[in-house]
C-alpha cells in the first residue's frame, strides 16, 4: 500500500505546479487549493477522505525576514491540510509542497476533532427534522408533527461533554420554531437539545430538562421592514443620503495583497481561522523604513454564558477555534457593509470534496474621514492664527456570523501612526425558553414573553508579533502613580506630583497582568536597543485598551480550562513559529485538560522575554447583561483598542499632512485671505460655509 501511495504521489508531482503568487504571504489561490487537494487525494489513494482545512502554511518568521531584508531565498510554498478518514478516529494533518506537488509531512491525531465548517453546520437542520425522537419532543412542546419544516436549529459545537469526549464529532442543536419562514426563531426557543453526530448525520441523544416548557404562543418578535410596518404603522421617514465621494480616487495603493497608505506598508492576508491577518507592518519615516509588527491577528475568542443549569454550561463557543472567523465570513455588499470608494479582496477555501470555494468581497478596504487630526488657534489675534488638519483613516474590515451573532472587525490605520482595532457586536441574542410562571434572574433577562437571554461575555485574544524598530523587543506595564513622597516633603512640597511607573517584564510570569482602571494601566511594547534622541526613551508602541473584563467563570471550570489565555489581560511568551492559537491547534471537544496552548507556552513562567523575539497576547472584550433594547435585533455594541506610537517619532508624524486651513501670525497681521480646501461643506439651513 505504501508503494502505491508513493507511485500516486509521484504521478501527481509529474503534473504542472500551480502558478506561485507574487508574495510569499498571499493566501492560497484556487489553483493552489485544487493542486493541494489532488496531491492529498493521490497520497491517500484508496481511502475515503474528506477535507476540513486547506490553507497556507506561512513561512517561518526567520525565513521570511531573510528573504525580505537580507536577500535570502524565497521561502517554500506550503499548504497545510486537515482531513477526516471515514471510520477512523480524529484527524490527519500535514503539509503539501506546492512546487513539487508532494506530501512532505503527515501525522494522525486520534484524540482531537477539527473545526466545524459551513458544510458541517448546514446538514444539521435536516438531520433533526427527520429524527423520530426529535419529532416526538417537538410534539410534546406543542408543535404538530406535520410542521417539522418550521423547526430550525443553530448548530453549535458541543464544547466538551464527558459522556462522549472526543470519540465522535458532535454538535449540539439549539432548537427553535418559526410559524412563518420570515419569522425570527429566537423569540420561540424550545427546551430540549439534540446531540448530532456530524459524520454519521444522526441524532445520538437528546438532552431534556427536568421541567418541561411548551413553545410560546406569543407572536414572533420580528424586525424586517414589513414586520415593523405591522407593529408601528410605518417606518421613519428616510433621512437624506450622506454620500461619501472621492472624485480624485483613493489615496491607497494595492499591489496584490500589499497595501501602501500614508507612510504605512503592510500585507493583508486572510485564512479560514483568523480571518484578516496583517503582516510585515512598517512605517516610512522620511525615507527610513521602520518595521513595527511582523504579524497581528485575532487568534481566539470565547463567549461563555452564565447560566449554571444543565446543559447551558456547554454554551461557551470559542468561535475562532471552533468555527473560524474566515470560514464564517460574510460576502460584503457595496454601500451597506462598506460605504464609499471600496476595494475588495476575495477569500478562497476548500470544500469537503477538495474543490475550491470562493467568498466574494470577504475583505473591504476603504478610507473614511476621521474628524480632526489636530488643531491650534491663537487667542491673541482673536483666533485668526490657526492650523486645522482633518484626519483620514484607512479601514480594513470583515464581518463574520457565528450562529446568532455578527462580529464586525475593523482594522484602522491612522495618520498619526496609530493602529486601532474596532469591533462591533450585533446580530441576535442567544435565547432560551421561559415558562409562563418563571423568572429569568439572576442568570439572564426576560427580553420578550417566554424568552430568557442569558448573561454572557465576549472575550477576544489579540496576538501581536512585534518588531518595533527591528528584532529584540520587550514589554512593560505602565501605571499612573501618585508621588510616594508626602505632601510638604522637599520632593513633593505641594502634593501634586505624579508619574508613570513602567515595569519591564523580565520573565513570562512577570507579564501575566490584568488591566487596572485605578492606575489607567497600559502596556508598552518596545525596543530596548534603540533610544529616542529627544526623550531618551526606547521607541515603543503602547497598547491602550480599557475594555478588559475578567473571565467570570471560576478557576478550574470547563470554561477557564478551555481558555487558558483568558485569565489575564496580557500574556507574553517567547516567540516560536507554531505558537499561533492559545487554546491549541484543534479546539472542538477539547476538555481543557493537559498542557497545550497558552498553558504550555507559559510553563513554569521562568523563560526570558526581555530583549528577545516575543509574542504578546492581549485579552479584551465585554460582559453583556441583556436588556429588551437588545432584542429582537441587537444594536451594534462597540469595543475598541489602540496601538499608538510613543517615543517612536521625534515629533507628531502627521504634521506633513496637508492642512484643511493654515494661517500664520504674520499672515494674519497682513490680513492675507485664505480659503479652506473643503468646497463641499455648507450651512444646513442657509447660504454656504464661511471661509474659515
Curated annotation (Swiss-Prot):
Query: What are the subcellular locations of this protein?
Result: Peroxisome
Question: Where do the annotations place Mn(2+) binding?
Answer: 465, 613-614
Q: Extract one GO BP annotation from the record.
A: amine metabolic process
Q: Where are the transmembrane segments?
A: none
Please indicate if the UniProt record lists DNA-binding as a keyword.
no
How is the cofactor bound, in the record's words? Answer: Binds 1 copper ion per subunit. Can also use zinc ion as cofactor. Contains 1 topaquinone per subunit.
Low complexity composition bias: residue spans: 1-22
The entry's active site is 319, 405
> What cystine linkages occur within this chain?
338-364
Reactions that this protein is recorded to catalyse: a primary methyl amine + O2 + H2O = an aldehyde + H2O2 + NH4(+)
- Annotated binding of substrate, by residue: 317-328, 402-407
**Ranges for region Disordered:** 1-26
User: In the record, which positions carry 2',4',5'-topaquinone?
Assistant: 405
Q: What is its EC number?
A: 1.4.3.21
Protein family per UniProt: Belongs to the copper/topaquinone oxidase family.
The record's subunit annotation is: Homodimer.
- Name of the protein described by the UniProt record: Peroxisomal primary amine oxidase
Q: Tell me the organism.
A: Pichia angusta
Amino acid at each position: 500500500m505504501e508503494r502505491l501511495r508513493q507511485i500516486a504521489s509521484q504521478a501527481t508531482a509529474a503534473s504542472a505546479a500551480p502558478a506561485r503568487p507574487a508574495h510569499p504571504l498571499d493566501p492560497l489561490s484556487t489553483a493552489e487549493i485544487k493542486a493541494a487537494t489532488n496531491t492529498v487525494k493521490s497520497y491517500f489513494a484508496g481511502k475515503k477522505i474528506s477535507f476540513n482545512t486547506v490553507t497556507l502554511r506561512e513561512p517561518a518568521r526567520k525565513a521570511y525576514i531573510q528573504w525580505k531584508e537580507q536577500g535570502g531565498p524565497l521561502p517554500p510554498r506550503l499548504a497545510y491540510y486537515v482531513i477526516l478518514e471515514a471510520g477512523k478516529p480524529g484527524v490527519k494533518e500535514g503539509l503539501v509542497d506546492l512546487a513539487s506537488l508532494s506530501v512532505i509531512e503527515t501525522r494522525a491525531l486520534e484524540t482531537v476533532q477539527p473545526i466545524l465548517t459551513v458544510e458541517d453546520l448546514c446538514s444539521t437542520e435536516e438531520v433533526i427534522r427527520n429524527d423520530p425522537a426529535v419529532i416526538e419532543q417537538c410534539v410534546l412542546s406543542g408543535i404538530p408533527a406535520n410542521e417539522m419544516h418550521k423547526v430550525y436549529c443553530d448548530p453549535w459545537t458541543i464544547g466538551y461533554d464527558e459522556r462522549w469526549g472526543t470519540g465522535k464529532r458532535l454538535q449540539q442543536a439549539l432548537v427553535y420554531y418559526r410559524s412563518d419562514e420570515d419569522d425570527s426563531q429566537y423569540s420561540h426557543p424550545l427546551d430540549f437539545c439534540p446531540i448530532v453526530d456530524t459524520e454519521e448525520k444522526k441524532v445520538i441523544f437528546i438532552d431534556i430538562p427536568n421541567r418541561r416548557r411548551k413553545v410560546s404562543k406569543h407572536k414572533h418578535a420580528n424586525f424586517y421592514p414589513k414586520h415593523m410596518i405591522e407593529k408601528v404603522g410605518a417606518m421613519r421617514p428616510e433621512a437624506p443620503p450622506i454620500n461619501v465621494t472621492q472624485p480624485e480616487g483613493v489615496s491607497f495603493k494595492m499591489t496584490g495583497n500589499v497595501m501602501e497608505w500614508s507612510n504605512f506598508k503592510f500585507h493583508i492576508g486572510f485564512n479560514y481561522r483568523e480571518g484578516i491577518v496583517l503582516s510585515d507592518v512598517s512605517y516610512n519615516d522620511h525615507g527610513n523604513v521602520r518595521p513595527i509588527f511582523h504579524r497581528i491577528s485575532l487568534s481566539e475568542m470565547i463567549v461563555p454564558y452564565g447560566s449554571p443549569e444543565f446543559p447551558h454550561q456547554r454554551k461557551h463557543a470559542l468561535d475562532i477555534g471552533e468555527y473560524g472567523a474566515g470560514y464564517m465570513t460574510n460576502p460584503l455588499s457595496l454601500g451597506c457593509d462598506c460605504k464609499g470608494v471600496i476595494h475588495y479582496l476575495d477569500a478562497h477555501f476548500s470544500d469537503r470534496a477538495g474543490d475550491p470555494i470562493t467568498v466574494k468581497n470577504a475583505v473591504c478596504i476603504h478610507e473614511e474621514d476621521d474628524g480632526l487630526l489636530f488643531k491650534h488657534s491663537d487667542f491673541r489675534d482673536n483666533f485668526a492664527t490657526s492650523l486645522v488638519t482633518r484626519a483620514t483613516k484607512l479601514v480594513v474590515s470583515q464581518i463574520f456570523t457565528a450562529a446568532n451573532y455578527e462580529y464586525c472587525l475593523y482594522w484602522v490605520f491612522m495618520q498619526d501612526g496609530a493602529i486601532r482595532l474596532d469591533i462591533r457586536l450585533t446580530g441576535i441574542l442567544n435565547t432560551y425558553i421561559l415558562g409562563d410562571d418563571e423568572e429569568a434572574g439572576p442568570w439572564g433577562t426576560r427580553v420578550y414573553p417566554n424568552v430568557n437571554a442569558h448573561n454572557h461575555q465576549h472575550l477576544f485574544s489579540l496576538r501581536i508579533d512585534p518588531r518595533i524598530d527591528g528584532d529584540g523587543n520587550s514589554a512593560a506595564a505602565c501605571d499612573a502613580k501618585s508621588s510616594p513622597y508626602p505632601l510638604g516633603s522637599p520632593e513633593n512640597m505641594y502634593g501634586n506630583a505624579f508619574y508613570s511607573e513602567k515595569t519591564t517584564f523580565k520573565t513570562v510570569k512577570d507579564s501575566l497582568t490584568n488591566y487596572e482602571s485605578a492606575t489607567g494601566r497600559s502596556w508598552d511594547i518596545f525596543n530596548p536597543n534603540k533610544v529616542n534622541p529627544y526623550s531618551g526613551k526606547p521607541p515603543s508602541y503602547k497598547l491602550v485598551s480599557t475594555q478588559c473584563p475578567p473571565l467570570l467563570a471560576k478557576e478550574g471550570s470547563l470554561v477557564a480550562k478551555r481558555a487558558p489565555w483568558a485569565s489575564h489581560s496580557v500574556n507574553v511568551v517567547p516567540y516560536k513559529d507554531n505558537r499561533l492559537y492559545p487554546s491549541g491547534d484543534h479546539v472542538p471537544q477539547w476538555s481543557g485538560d493537559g498542557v497545550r496552548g497558552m498553558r504550555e507556552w507559559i510553563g513554569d513562567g521562568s523563560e526570558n522575554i526581555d530583549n528577545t523575539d516575543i509574542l504578546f497576547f492581549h485579552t479584551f472584550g465585554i460582559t453583556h447583561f441583556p436588556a429588551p433594547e437588545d432584542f429582537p435585533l441587537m444594536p451594534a455594541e462597540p469595543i475598541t483598542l489602540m496601538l499608538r506610537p510613543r517615543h517612536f517619532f521625534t515629533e507628531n508624524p502627521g504634521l506633513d499632512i496637508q492642512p484643511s486651513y493654515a494661517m500664520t501670525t504674520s499672515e494674519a497681521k497682513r490680513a492675507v485671505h485664505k480659503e479652506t480646501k473643503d468646497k463641499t461643506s455648507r450651512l444646513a439651513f442657509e447660504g454656504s460655509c464661511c471661509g474659515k
